């Protein structure tokens, strides 16, 4: 279990094509889907993220770390870590990596319960997965902090 930092957080469900973003506050115990960053170059994606950072003024980031169900590294594990380090480098905010196993399954389940299907489902799935990642972090699940220094 980790100490939950105070203040606003932005959470990310990183993918090469789409990055789901959620926003929340641990003190309030609330999180919600926010946006999906799509397409373009890395610079364009980070410009979109910079707008969200400007708007929401987070104190830290939470990034889902994909691993296989048995806990071994996934093909995307390295890319998600790289993304988190870039967030830290650009915005000078701590990054917490959390196990994102089953976040997409959870998001699919929530969207099915809400009867969200088709194009609408695809447009919000990554955001809801980011919300699930943030919710897990707020609930005290295991996390690893990166603050600009490799340990």
Swiss-Prot record:
GO terms for biological process: rRNA 5'-end processing. It holds the Pfam family RuvX. Its EC number is 3.1.-.-. It is an enzyme of class 3 (hydrolase). Could be a nuclease involved in processing of the 5'-end of pre-16S rRNA. Belongs to the YqgF nuclease family. This is Putative pre-16S rRNA nuclease.
């Amino acid at each position: 279990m980790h100490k939950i930092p105070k203040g606003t957080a932005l959470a990310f469900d990183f993918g090469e094509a789409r990055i789901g973003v959620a926003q929340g506050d641990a003190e309030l115990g609330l999180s919600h889907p926010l946006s999906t960053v799509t397409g373009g170059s890395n610079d364009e994606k980070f410009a979109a993220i910079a707008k969200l950072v400007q708007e929401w003024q987070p104190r830290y980031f939470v990034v889902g770390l994909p691993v296989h169900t048995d806990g071994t590294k996934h093909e995307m594990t390295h890319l998600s870590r790289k993304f988190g380090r870039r967030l830290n480098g650009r915005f000078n905010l701590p990054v917490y990596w959390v196990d994102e196993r089953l976040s997409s399954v959870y998001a699919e389940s929530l969207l099915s319960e809400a009867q969200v299907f088709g194009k609408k489902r695809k447009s919000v799935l990554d955001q809801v997965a980011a919300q699930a990642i943030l919710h897990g972090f707020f609930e005290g699940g295991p996390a690893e902090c990166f603050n600009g220094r490799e340990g």
